């Protein structure tokens, strides 16, 4: 049995290999696996040149992914996002800066979209515990602080939580 119970498939127009290279470069354990290419078969359906990249298998942050060049039929949206949990502000800054580079977009409350349109959340360790604290006043202050941010500032979130 596989050590990974499932693989996340990301449907791109034609940027699968570029996306896999970016995502694997972000994480110390990132690596690209098998690359499958389109053949002559099925051209009437896929309309891709023979030999062009069809799928790229890769691993990033311990997760298995397949990036598919499936064409413009489907676009990414915020209904699905990938969450990166960070221990330090330097980690948050690293992921945030890399993922918003070259056309990525900052969104609100720790969310961003990378240049491919994939949604990410870059959050500090302990964030969900602060938001779900039994101390409702502390959780409320944390939420108020969160709504003022795009990229999270750990010190400001902790200060808001502490009151």
Which residues make up each language-model segment?
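Core segments of cupin and vicinal oxygen chelate
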Residues: 10-62
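A short, polar/charged loop-to-alpha-helix boundary motif
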Residues: 127-141
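Extracytoplasmic/secreted proteins, especially bacterial periplasmic and envelope-associated proteins
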Residues: 18, 94, 138-141
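A short, acidic/glycine-rich surface segment
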Residues: 40-45, 66-68, 129-130
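Acidic/histidine-enriched, glycine/proline-rich intrinsically disordered or flexible terminal extensions
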Residues: 139-163
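Hydrophobic faces of well-ordered beta-strands that scaffold small-molecule active sites
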Residues: 6-8
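Vicinal oxygen chelate
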Residues: 12, 16, 26, 60-64, ...
